[in-house]
Amino acid sequence: MEHYISLFVRAVFVENMALAFFLGMCTFIAISKKVETAIGLGVAVIVVLGITMPVNNLIYANILKDGALAWAGLPEVDLSFLGLLTFIGVIAALVQILEMTLDKYVPSLYNALGVFLPLITVNCAIMGGSLFMVERDYNLAESTVYGIGAGVSWALAIAALAGIREKLKYSDVPAGLQGLGITFITIGLMSLGFMSFSGVQL
């Protein structure tokens, strides 16, 4: 149990998707103007990462990995080169299924997140999570915990940035830095803050 708790904490703080690896920057900057919308997108990212990571793990471990098809009498087949394409397909399919499910059963939540759900398909933080899973050889349970932790890390970062950007509207920012300029500086300072966790061994 300790291993999974440390994996979750490491995913949220030490290896923050947005502020340590700078993944998902396009939506991170574009949707961080209001806290409400940032939290909505953050929750959607948590759900998608929490679902796609274990699904991709099952597909990779049982079909794509070198020797994974031994159960089918094909122990020498290595389909790992199809990993990237498979992960993209799984992410796109699961986002569509999630979108249709929310539309049918939870229309209020769909109306709140509907605009942001398609953006998640092209969020490289989702793909990054699956590639880290393969590189670090996580099992199914570790993939699930890491997926949820990575989603929480991205949601935490975008919510924090949105809060700061809302306050910056009332600040006296120099003309040359208004808009994206001060946003990039803010992200850099937030990233420096999260670097303080880099020495933590879990």
From Swiss-Prot:
Organism: Ectopseudomonas mendocina (strain ymp)
Subunit structure: Composed of six subunits; NqrA, NqrB, NqrC, NqrD, NqrE and NqrF.
GO biological process: respiratory electron transport chain; sodium ion transport
Main location: membrane
Similarity annotation: Belongs to the NqrDE/RnfAE family.
Keywords: Cell inner membrane, Cell membrane, Ion transport, Membrane, NAD, Sodium, Sodium transport, Translocase, Transmembrane, Transmembrane helix, Transport, Ubiquinone
Function in brief: NQR complex catalyzes the reduction of ubiquinone-1 to ubiquinol by two successive reactions, coupled with the transport of Na(+) ions from the cytoplasm to the periplasm. NqrA to NqrE are probably involved in the second step, the conversion of ubisemiquinone to ubiquinol.
Protein name: Na(+)-translocating NADH-quinone reductase subunit E
Record's bilayer topology term: Multi-pass membrane protein
Location in or out of the cell: Cell inner membrane
